[in-house]
Amino acid sequence: VVVITGASSGLGLAAAKALAETGKWHVVMACRDFLKASKAAKAAGMADGSYTVMHLDLASLDSVRQFVDAFRRAEMPLDVLVCNAAIYRPTARKPTFTAEGVEMSVGVNHLGHFLLARLLLEDLQKSDYPSRRLVIVGSITGNDNTLAGNVPPKANLGDLRGLAGGLTGASGSAMIDGDESFDGAKAYKDSKVCNMLTMQEFHRRYHEDTGITFSSLYPGCIATTGLFREHIPLFRTLFPPFQKFVTKGFVSEAESGKRLAQVVGEPSLTKSGVYWSWNKDSASFENQLSQEASDPEKARKVWELSEKLVGLA
């Protein structure tokens, strides 16, 4: 059994379909919009019985806890958890907030997943599947040792003062580095750096004792995905051909879904603490993370601040 957050569209749906089609995986589609996810699974041709749709709104920590309770009541084993759902609001100049009053990009992409993964770690440990995994979807945009990661505004967590202040925007900053002005594109990139730091911190704290594989991946640029739905129309028109012909980083949703499915089930990809990428021939390789995204001291601080913000400390 694999749980995939944000499986109602894009990469999450493509991976859910790829895994369900193997006949070996039952996919739990953990989605904010139950109806949309059910329709999407049917439209994708996923066979009845190969998936279960469950409600999860990562913008509410109560909803995360309710999902975990509901999943346990369903008495399914948990063999792999995929943290995939993401909010990207690149043109936003004002923050929006989660139910707890935390800036939305970091609240959903990082903190909601952080709580979910911490709670479900117990379930992963109970599974007798020999290759249990926790997979966090990263992004090249948060990795400043790549071309795409150097497109401004660059990810930068600074000294984490905004995160320490709870990212409320009211009493302090809604940006992790404490910047007074809000930038939606940077908030997304910062949240993905938090994802990558979290994966490594999970690896350091739990891999040796549990044998669980903790990994992250960048499945390639899915230029046609709905993740870009808030971008300016000109960008949406120009970006796919630019990716396809200029940077050659373009992959279809189906191909990216297969890549995520590989990281979920492929026996050769069991190494823990790794950030997987794919080359032009679609061969997987271990990618280097930027200095900030692989800073163990920063990872520890993000972990400890996140524990407080989700009520685990």
Swiss-Prot record:
The name of this protein is Protochlorophyllide reductase
Identify the EC number(s): 1.3.1.33
**InterPro entries per UniProt:** NAD(P)-bd_dom_sf, Prochl_reduct, SDR_fam
One annotated GO molecular function: protochlorophyllide reductase activity
What is the phylogenetic placement of the source species in the record? Answer: Eukaryota, Viridiplantae, Streptophyta, Embryophyta, Tracheophyta
Q: Which family does it belong to?
A: Belongs to the short-chain dehydrogenases/reductases (SDR) family. POR subfamily.
Q: What's an example Gene Ontology biological process for this entry?
A: chlorophyll biosynthetic process
Subcellular location(s) of the protein = Plastid, Chloroplast
Q: Which organism is it from?
A: Avena sativa
Please provide, in alphabetical order, the Gene Ontology terms of the cellular component aspect for this entry: chloroplast
Q: Tell me the pathway.
A: Porphyrin-containing compound metabolism; chlorophyll biosynthesis
Reaction(s) the record says it catalyses: chlorophyllide a + NADP(+) = protochlorophyllide a + NADPH + H(+)
Keyword Nucleus attached: no
Identify the keywords attached in UniProt to this record, alphabetized.
Chlorophyll biosynthesis, Chloroplast, NADP, Oxidoreductase, Photosynthesis, Plastid
Q: What does this protein do?
A: Phototransformation of protochlorophyllide (Pchlide) to chlorophyllide (Chlide).
Can you tell me where the transmembrane regions are? none
Q: What is its main location?
A: plastid
Keyword Membrane among UniProt keywords: no
